[in-house]
């Protein structure tokens, strides 16, 4: 008996390595030592560029958005989403990405699908200036249903110790700015899929007039990467904190960067809610608090800006033609009370 008889095909694994090597090589920066295929990936930090470098790491996935990609046969988007999500996570602490690794597992290796996924990762890595230096592609027969896979990403970035964003500098009077999301990004898909495919019984290629798009394409919209838009703002020290709005929505993520004694006061009417969220809210008859905890509701990143830098941040974002909204402010908060309060109503 051979390994292939148990469902593991070494020849196909070798083909996969050859197909993805080119996409990884295109991301390599000056810090990369060696290439794809070693037992470990090597990266040399430029000591001349950094005085007191601190490495920042993060790991994440794209959740059940993968189910949408599998149903539509479009995989490069979620590959890119994985990188963008991780880049945004370390950006919150002021870090610039250095390198990225991925973990991909499926029951039977499909070289075409894997190449799509890695091509998407490669594209997002190049845009972020991040090297895709390695990963693991696992063939696990009997573990995943045919055509399904799981995907995770791991990123390492760097920030000067003195420039780490900890949130400790957040004070009452700071302004809250928000950058829009493209849609669900990579969170809330379990609820969205239940509403769309079980409650409404739609197909991925069903056109939804209220959304202005085929529902599958709408749900597969890419997760924005905010690093290019915020690079200068972060470098100049114009923010006291950043919050990436992912699982848990605004109430679940903004408090993670707020020190004790303060709260965020948000005006829910201060930004336009994308049609997809209005559609989902109507389908599920979802109340405001549940919406805010389940979805990003059109907000992908929140900036906490001291009063002295408000005009500078506004001017920088306008110069880059970035959409943004001023959604609230930081106020004094009491222990034991919610860290995020809101007024007004969502534009549903």
Each language-model region and where it sits:
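A short, polar/proline- and glycine-enriched secondary-structure boundary/capping micro-motif
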Residues: 66-68, 188-190, 325
